[in-house]
Amino acid sequence: MEVALIYASMTGNTEEIAKIISDQVEKLALDVKTFHIEFDDIMALDLKDYDAILFGTYTWGDGDLPFEVEDFYDDLADEDLTGKVVGLFGSCDSYYPSYGAAIETMAQQFKAVGADVVEPLLKIELAPGPEDTERIQQFTQIFVTKVKK
């Protein structure tokens, strides 16, 4: 089974989370193809080619989607991902009033096109640290278990 792992990262925090998740998913016997949304060739219409999806983003400003995610978000509305398992994650900053709002926005869009979104969403304060290891492992295990059903 092949998983598309797509992420947006400005400071490297979400990229670091993506690498940890990718390593763990591969250890649990799924293949992962990783895409940086800004630099790699991945579009919403490509998602149908994968068995499951992991999507990571940071939140811009007071709760906005990052610029590089906006077109993907809009294009996602035209896709049918009924039954596809999707795990959402990202780095967040508690300095801002809308903690991880972009992750929630993407989750709603994936749900609107029929995806089976893994709960809870994985929100990490800034860069992942040792205190986040267990939460990331739990998120990854829930995701892989749903995919293998």
For each feature predicted by the language model, list its residue ranges:
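Residues in the short beta-alpha loop(s) of Rossmann-like NAD(P)-binding domains
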Residues: 9, 38
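Short hydrophobic segments within beta-strands
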Residues: 6-8, 89
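Extreme N-terminal starter segment of soluble prokaryotic enzymes
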Residues: 1-4
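FMN-binding flavodoxin-like domain, especially the glycine-rich phosphate-binding loop
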Residues: 13-16, 23-24, 28, 35, ...
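Short acidic active-site motifs
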Residues: 39-43
